[in-house]
Amino acid sequence: MSRLGALGGSRAGLGLLLGTAAGLGFLCVLYSQRWKRTQRHGRSQSLPNSLDYAQTSERGRQVTQLRAIPGEAGDAAMLSSLPQEGQEKVLDRLDFVLTSLMALRREVEELQRSLQGLAGEIVGEVRSHMEENQRVARRRRFPFARERSDSTGSSSVYFTASSGATLTDAESEGGYTTANAESDYERDSDKESEDAEDEVSCETVKMGRKDSLDLDMEVASSPASAALEDDDSSGLEDVQLLLQQADELHQGSEQNKQEGFQLLLNNKLAYGSRQDFLWRLARAYSDMTELTEEESEKKSYALNGKEEAEAALKKGDESAASHLWYAVLCGQLAEHEGISKRIQSGFSFKEHVDKAIELQPEDPRGHFLLGRWCYQVSHLSWLEKKTATALFESPLSATVQDALQSFLKAEELQPGFSKAGRVYISKCYRELGKNSEARKWLNLAQELPNITNEDSAFQKDLEELEVILGK
């Protein structure tokens, strides 16, 4: 009986141990599953905060919610161990980090959009530049009317003057015929006759060259050569009178400037090989750019004027006026172009203005243009500065102090040279904190009349300075 009691006691103890072990194992499994679920819950709650759902206004509610879940591991347990003030500081820092990240993301997105727009603009400018070069090449290759097409498959209709003779610039185009008006036989006949005429003309040129050599020897020793020299001197006087008249018209009214432009344009065929004529024609194109109101006409005048100034520079690099007006037309053309083209024109503008000042340092116009360039560069936008740095090795750099020195130099060389120049001086002094000097130059600017369009445009700036500086 005692043996059975002992056996029953041992079995009861063994059962108690097994039950205790099973209970502990079951509790471990439950705790492990609950810990994993809590970890997943913590990650799902922290994810929205990284995606712009954090709100500082609900900080107290979030702290209460974390405290209301007892026994959970993770951030809630960590925060619950901190005092109320410490929890608020941690949440404030997290909100600040998230807000900074969101602001950074918006800035990156804005920069990406700007770069995409800039890339599209550059591609468009390159395409338009290539198309313009192709048009110029076609104009140079086909200076006369193009030959009519022999294609009969196209339904296009080309129009050409039917007067028979070649039209000049002064003539007007008369009646029109279609491209397929002539028969194939007539075109073949015309080509054969043209070939025959070419052969005859070649023989004529050869004979003419031989005769001209003999004639030159005779003319050189004849009394008529003295008369030819007199004609050359009279022709030189004529061109000098023409250039003097163009200078006087340039200094006159708007109508005078238009007359000067037409005068030079009409005489381009006769004197277009002279450098002093070409830069004056470029100057006249600059005047027309200022006078016209239509944007397309402004760009056309500026482009043609830049080409004339470039042709003048090809005649020689020692002409200060050619460099000066090339720079002016670069600036006028840049007003109708994109940001990258404007920055490139800015480099070219500075280069030619510096060259003009080097060749003619006593001319106030060069110093005025340099001062205006420095002032505009000192006020470039952030995007323009970054674009210049990205596209060019040496970015544009200038200060308001640089601009002031150039404007003062122009005023020193010729007092009262420009009303706009005095307004610029006043603006520079104001930005440098010298209001008394700014007020002085503002009063001096009011004494000058409006001569150029730039002077008139600065009237509004002058009035604003009056309000800021007072009288």
UniProtKB/Swiss-Prot annotation:
PANTHER family: REGULATOR OF MICROTUBULE DYNAMICS PROTEIN (PTHR16056), REGULATOR OF MICROTUBULE DYNAMICS PROTEIN 3 (PTHR16056:SF18)
Organism: Rattus norvegicus (Rat)
Ranges for region Disordered: 168-203
GO cellular component: cytoplasm; glutamatergic synapse; intercellular bridge; mitochondrial outer membrane; mitochondrion; mitotic spindle pole; nucleus; organelle membrane contact site
SUPFAM superfamilies linked to this entry: TPR-like (SSF48452)
Pfam family, one: RMD1-3
Predominant location category: mitochondrion
Record topological domains on the Mitochondrial intermembrane side: 1-12
Membrane-spanning ranges: 13-35
Annotated protein name in UniProt: Regulator of microtubule dynamics protein 3
